[in-house]
Amino acid sequence: MVIAIDFDGTITEQSFPEVGALKKDADVYIRRLWSEGHAIVINTCRSGKYEGMAEDFLRANDIPFSYINSNMPHLIVDYGQDCRKISADVYIDDRCLMGLPDTWEEIYNMVQKINQKKIV
C-alpha cells in the first residue's frame, strides 16, 4: 500500500516552523510499515527550507520514506503529471476528521486492518 503520513503533529509534536520532538514510537512503527513493503510518502505543508528541515530530521532519525510531497512515479505516469494532491491508500494525519489515535501502535494496528481488507 501507499501510506501518506503528515509530518508536523503526526510524526513529530507540532512546533512549526521548528521541528518538534519525535512522537513516541513513530519511528519504530514507520520502519515496521516500510519493512513490510509499504511505500511511505511524507505529505506535509512544509516547503523550501522547512521541507528540508523535515527531510533532515527523518534521515537523522533513520525514518524511511519513498518521497516527500510527491506522488509515486507510476501514479505520475498514470495521471500524466504530479498533481498537487498526494494519492495514497491510507492517510495518517493529526488533522483528520476523527482525530489521530493516541499511540503509534494503535495507528499501526488500524493500517494492518485496512491492509487485510484490501487482500481479501
Segments predicted by a language model, with ranges:
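Alpha-helical substrate-recognition element adjacent to the catalytic core
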Residues: 1-73
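C-terminal cap/substrate-recognition subdomain and adjoining C-terminal extension
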Residues: 51-120
